[in-house]
From Swiss-Prot:
The lineage of its organism: Bacteria, Bacillati, Bacillota, Clostridia, Lachnospirales. GO terms for molecular function: cobalt ion binding; manganese ion binding; racemase and epimerase activity, acting on carbohydrates and derivatives. PANTHER family: HYDROXYPYRUVATE ISOMERASE, INOSOSE DEHYDRATASE. This is D-psicose 3-epimerase. Pfam families: AP_endonuc_2.
């Protein structure tokens, strides 16, 4: 398993393409140009586009080669739909999820993507109008991820189990729960994914949670308590950086800010107002670059 080539080993900084958009589909080459010019190491993409937009082997190879040309590593994120749910009581929903992921993982391998993060063990957005069976759903997720991890190992793609806040998920809300979960699955290619936005709601001490995760931490999302870019809110970034240094974190640290209301993204992320006064592309670029410089300075990595 590898995230980066040996000559560029170490934690790398990235950003999710959806910071600039209101929909989950985009021209990824455009955002490769942008994030490379801004100084990032990583662009995170949505896997939904690999089913609906980038559908051919030639297109996937083209994206891979363009990323290399720009000096970028690609990472991937996904929120499964309710119809393709690894923890479902419905065998058809589980079958559809397995089919989707077993088709997706070789595509990620072809693209030289080695981390897939998100609430992969369940579905998103979660329906809280029904009585969710946490223990039963957790057991089914463990069983099905054990099977799926074999394909992940063959494709050398780490599955990052994202720890979500109580308003977006119910199976994994804390790092402690995620540790037990990934240990029970028992695969080198199933790891924990932490997100500072969610951690701010659920963790008593964010830095301690990172240290507890240790080498189980496979992926990291960065964002303020209100989804702004790092450095524009109140999170304890110096403590977070120290914890990452303490565990010698070698993965990607990907910013996942959402600042625009409207569109599918604004609706699903629950952004009900514009979060910054200037939403011009130039201003968003400026904030992203400033956040990158802030993280590199404060984290010291």
């Amino acid at each position: 398993m590898r995230y980066f080539k040996e000559e560029v080993a170490g934690m790398k900084y990235g950003i999710y393409f959806a910071y600039w958009t209101k929909e989950w589909f985009a021209d990824y080459k455009k955002y490769m140009d942008k994030v490379s010019a801004l100084g990032f190491d990583v662009l995170e993409i949505s896997c939904a586009a690999l089913r609906d937009v980038y559908t051919t082997k030639e297109q996937l190879i083209e994206l891979r080669e363009y990323a290399k040309e720009k000096g970028l590593v690609l990472t991937a994120g996904y929120g499964p739909t309710k119809a393709e749910n690894l923890c479902s009581e419905d065998p058809e929903a589980v079958r559809r999820a397995m089919t989707f992921f077993k088709d997706l993982l070789p595509k990620l391998q072809l693209m030289d993507i080695h981390i897939l993060g998100g609430g992969l063990y369940s579905y998103w957005p979660v329906d809280f109008t029904i009585n969710n069976d946490k223990q039963g759903d957790r057991a089914r997720a463990v069983r099905n991820l054990r099977e799926l991890s074999k394909t992940a190992e063959e494709c050398d793609v780490v599955l990052g189990m994202e720890v979500l806040n109580r308003y977006e998920g119910y199976i994994l809300n804390t790092c402690e729960e995620a540790i037990d979960f990934v240990d029970e699955i028992g695969s080198s290619h199933v790891k924990i994914m932490l997100d500072t936005f969610h951690m701010n709601i659920e963790e008593t001490n964010m830095a301690d949670a990172i240290r507890k995760a240790g080498d189980r931490l496979g992926h990291l999302h960065l964002g303020e308590q209100n989804r702004l870019v790092p450095g524009k809110g109140s999170l304890p970034w110096a403590e977070i950086g120290q914890a990452l240094r303490d565990i010698n974190y070698q993965g990607a640290a990907v910013m996942e800010p959402f600042v625009m209301q409207g569109g599918t993204i604004g609706s699903e992320i629950k952004v009900w107002r514009d979060m910054v006064p200037d939403l011009s592309e130039e201003a968003l670029d400026r904030d992203a670059k400033g956040a990158l410089e802030f993280c590199r300075h404060v984290f010291g990595i």
